[in-house]
UniProtKB/Swiss-Prot annotation:
A biological process term (GO) from this entry: biotin biosynthetic process
EC number: 2.8.1.6
Protein's organism: Mycobacterium marinum (strain ATCC BAA-535 / M)
Complexes and interactors: Homodimer.
SMART domains linked to this entry: BATS, Elp3
Protein name per UniProt: Biotin synthase
This protein's record includes keyword Kinase: no
Length: 349
């Protein structure tokens, strides 16, 4: 056994036998066999010392390259309906229950189409229409249908949606509209969810996701790291996602919003955030892992490069729903510098 494979572990048994090093285990289990780490193994990765971060990121990158390939999928998002949401997601400035500065507003169809055009020009293959709602009503679904039709008439791009929790009938309607992928985040570990949301349950979200998959749409499901969860709960969340097995996992990092219950939380340290990126890649070797909201404030420009070389293989370009993102040009230049090709539209269809 190599030196790397026999590093001391806090989990050594009472007989004094040293446990195998978790990254050596991951190299065999994940890199060679494509089997994701389980919850306990992910926790061991999250507990690694800072001096092993680069080793972790290098392994996560190797896993991503072997099981996902070099291509990076680029996506843009737009808010069709902003603010006024009746739910109490403690991280979200769009809740109508908090004293945040975001106010309710709707986007018109011509503006939606123009946003899709600009997104496609950036090289993106996915354009996600988002609404701040518990779930869509008839008016919203009608607006979404009109928007999708208008986009398809003028723009060559996949259309995704994120419209909250759905009924079985609404799932079928969206599938019939040609929605390529549906985003609905579990947000955090099942055991921590009630600390984040109280107006609906984790199980309700899970039910929507299973119906989406059954209807033939791709499933996009991730969450936000740095909302006060423990490392154990972060590992649990990775295991929850592995059980769901979505097509895409967007990783957000809390960007505390004024007026929300989480507005005074500390931003996740960059090293801890990158360690989570590597750990989630080792838990989900074949899944599209997307850099999403909060990466700018958490990681900065250097962190974007380290994440893409540490397991990430998809990005959201431009701005987010209520916060500013990196300019699309900055991300595209970075990908070009790293010689990472953009995923082509025909490979996404």
């Amino acid at each position: 056994m190599t030196q790397a494979a026999t590093r001391p572990s806090n989990d050594a048994g009472q007989d004094g036998v040293t446990e195998p090093d978790i990254l050596a285990v991951a190299r065999q289990q994940v890199l060679e066999r494509g089997e994701g780490l389980n919850q306990e193994q992910v926790l061991q990765v999250l507990q690694l010392s800072e001096d092993r971060l680069e080793e972790l990121l290098a392994l996560a990158h190797d896993v991503r390259m072997r099981w996902c390939g070099p291509e990076v999928e680029v996506e843009g998002i737009i808010s069709l309906k902003t603010g006024g949401c009746p739910e109490d997601c403690h991280f979200c400035s769009q809740s109508g229950l908090f004293s945040s500065p975001v106010r309710s507003a709707w986007l018109d169809i011509p503006s939606l189409v123009e946003a899709a055009k600009q997104t496609a020009k950036s090289g993106a293959t996915e354009f996600c229409i988002v609404a701040a709602v518990r779930g869509p009503d008839a008016r919203l679904l009608s607006q979404v249908a009109a928007g999708i039709e208008a986009i398809r008439n003028e723009v060559e791009i996949n259309v995704a949606c994120s419209l909250g929790m759905l009924t079985a009938e609404q799932v079928e309607q969206l599938a019939a509209m040609g929605v390529h992928r549906y985003n609905h985040n579990l947000e955090t570990a099942r055991s921590y969810f009630t600390n984040v949301v109280t107006t609906h349950t984790w199980e309700e979200r899970w039910q929507t996701l299973t119906m989406v998959r059954d209807a033939g749409m791709e499933v996009c499901c991730g969450g936000i790291l740095g909302m006060g969860e423990t490392l154990e709960q972060r590992a649990e969340f990775a295991a929850n996602l592995a059980e769901l097995d979505p097509d895409e996992v967007p990783l957000n990092f809390l960007n505390p919003r004024p007026g929300t219950p989480f507005g005074d939380l500390e931003v996740l340290p960059a090293g801890e955030a990158l360690k989570a990126v590597g750990a989630f890649r080792l838990a989900l070797p074949r899944t599209m892992l997307r850099f999403a909201g909060g990466r700018e404030i958490t990681l900065g420009d250097l962190g974007a490069k380290r994440g893409i070389l540490g397991g990430i293989n998809a990005v959201i370009v431009g701005n987010y729903l209520t916060t500013l993102g990196r300019p699309a040009e900055a991300d595209l230049e970075l990908l070009e510098d790293l010689q990472m090709p953009l995923k082509a539209l025909n490979a996404s269809l």
